[in-house]
From Swiss-Prot:
Signal sequence range: none
Native organism: Pseudothermotoga lettingae (strain ATCC BAA-301 / DSM 14385 / NBRC 107922 / TMO)
Protein name as it appears in the record: Probable transcriptional regulatory protein Tlet_1011
A single cellular component GO annotation: cytosol
GO molecular function: DNA binding
Main localization (coarse): cytoplasm
InterPro entries noted in UniProt: Integrase-like_N (IPR017856), TACO1_YebC-like_2nd/3rd_dom (IPR048300), TACO1_YebC_N (IPR049083), Transcrip_reg_TACO1-like (IPR002876), Transcrip_reg_TACO1-like_dom3 (IPR026564), YebC-like (IPR029072)
Keyword Membrane: no
Similarity-based family: Belongs to the TACO1 family.
Location in or out of the cell: Cytoplasm
Length: 253
C-alpha cells in the first residue's frame, strides 16, 4: 500500500525535471523570503532558512536568486509581502487535506482554493476540523542506492535521535521530532549519506481510497500543487500501489 508519501516523491521528481521547474523556483523563492523574514538572514541560526537554501540548491537555483530572495525577506531589498496561511479541507472519499500557502493576497488564494476543491469533489473545512489528524514532524529522505547496509543506517539514525525509519520504499524515510531534524541530518551527512530534510505534517490515521475516489484525489492533489500560492499539501489517503501507478500514468498521457 502507498499513500501521500509516494505521490509526493513522484511529484517532486517531476517538478524538478519538466517545464514546471519555473513554478518550483517561484515556490522556493517565496519560502526563502518568508524564512528570512521570520528568523533572520543567517542560515546558521535559522534552521528553516537553512532547509530552504538546501532545497533551492538541490533544484539548481542560481546563487544570485537565492541571495536576492533572502535580502527581500530581511528587508535589505524591496519585495512583495507574503503571508503564511494554513487551510484545512476535505477531499473525495473523506480524505483530510492540510494545505500550507504563502500568499500576497489571501482573498484571491481562498477564492482559487475553493474553486479547485469544488471542481475536484472537495471542500474547505472549518479551522481545526482536520488539523488534529496531522502531527508536525521532521522528515529526512535518503536515496535507496546510497544505503549499502540498511541496519547500519537505522542504528545510526536512532542513535542520533530519529523516532522512526521506513526502509520499504525509495527513498528511505526517517522521521524525527522537529527539534532533532537538523542534528540527525548532519550526523548522516557526516557519515557520507546525502539526505534531504524538511518539516512535514504526518497523519495519525489514514483513509483507504479506490476506484473513482482514487482518481479524484490524485487529480485534486495535482491541481492544488499547481497553484502558485500553495507551498505544500498534506493528506491522509492510502491507495494500492498498482492502482496509483496506473492512475498517474493515465494522468501524464
Amino acid at each position: 500500500m502507498s499513500g501521500h508519501n509516494k505521490w509526493a516523491n513522484i511529484k517532486h521528481r517531476k517538478m524538478a525535471q519538466d517545464a514546471k521547474k519555473s513554478q518550483l523556483f517561484t515556490k522556493l523563492i517565496r519560502e526563502l523570503i518568508v524564512a528570512a523574514r521570520e528568523g533572520g538572514g543567517d542560515p546558521e541560526t535559522n534552521s528553516r532558512l537553512r532547509t530552504a537554501i538546501e532545497k533551492a540548491k538541490e533544484a539548481n537555483m542560481p546563487r544570485e536568486n537565492i541571495e536576492k530572495a533572502i535580502k527581500r525577506g530581511t528587508g535589505e531589498l524591496e519585495g512583495v509581502e507574503y503571508q503564511e496561511i494554513i487551510y484545512e479541507a476535505y477531499g473525495p472519499g473523506g480524505v483530510a487535506l492540510y494545505i500550507r500557502a504563502l500568499t500576497d493576497n489571501k482573498n484571491r488564494t481562498a477564492q482559487e482554493l475553493r474553486h479547485v476543491l469544488s471542481r475536484h469533489g472537495g471542500s474547505l473545512a472549518d479551522l481545526g476540523a482536520v488539523g488534529w489528524i496531522f502531527e508536525r514532524k521532521g522528515i529526512i529522505s535518503v536515496p535507496r542506492d546510497q544505503v549499502a547496509n540498511v541496519e547500519e543506517l537505522v542504528m545510526m539514525a536512532i542513535d542520533a535521535g530519529a523516532e522512526d525509519i521506513d526502509d520499504q520504499d525509495d527513498p528511505v524515510r526517517i522521521t524525527t521530532s522537529p527539534d532533532n531534524l537538523m542534528s540527525v541530518k548532519e550526523e548522516l551527512e557526516k557519515n557520507g549519506y546525502k539526505a534531504e530534510a524538511g518539516i512535514s505534517y504526518v497523519p495519525k490515521n489514514t483513509v483507504q481510497v479506490t476506484g473513482k475516489d482514487a482518481e479524484k484525489i490524485l487529480a485534486l492533489l495535482n491541481a492544488l500543487e499547481d497553484m502558485d500560492d500553495v507551498q505544500d499539501v498534506y493528506s491522509n489517503f492510502e491507495m494500492d500501489d498498482a492502482e496509483m501507478e496506473a492512475i498517474l500514468s493515465q494522468m501524464n498521457q
